[in-house]
Amino acid sequence: MRTRLDHVGVNVRDLAAQTAWYTKAFGLTSVFEFHLEGPGLSGIVLAHPHGWRIELLARPGSAPGLRAPDPLTAALTEGYGHFAVTTPELAPVYQALVAHGAGEAVPPGPSPEPGIRMAWVTDPEGNLIELIEKNAE
């Protein structure tokens, strides 16, 4: 089966604020925006220069979902828990995201997977983001 992950969708409370944060923190650019009048759903697809994309969705009357402070707590709830990005330089990326307002969930350290280092942050609304450095020494 020939498939490829296209994007990750994140439901947000404040579309404008989250768009500004993801754009600034990750260097993303807008691909397209949309609004569905009937349900009042608004969204934007943002792209990274390396090809990954994220879709931010907002709808009036939404309620907060999973807001776990770390990945171990998130694993107590079934369903979507986080998205992950890779980087060749874990510590500087972690620090840059924190400097842009990311919450510190798990500082850089070894992953359970051999040769991998990881860290976790949260976006301004508390959504978990995993950072992965492969082939770490």
Features from the language model and the residues they span:
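Vicinal oxygen chelate
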Residues: M1, S42-A47, V85, Y94-E137
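Core segments of cupin and vicinal oxygen chelate
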Residues: R2, V10-I54
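Hydrophobic adenine-recognition pocket in adenosine-nucleotide-binding enzymes
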Residues: V8, F83
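Helix N-cap motif at beta-to-alpha junctions
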Residues: D14-L15, P88-L90
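Short, P/G- and charge-enriched loop/turn segments at secondary-structure junctions
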Residues: F32, A68-A74
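Active-site/binding-pocket entry motifs
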Residues: W52, P60-A63, E137
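Helix-adjacent hinge/juxtasegments
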Residues: L56, T73-L76
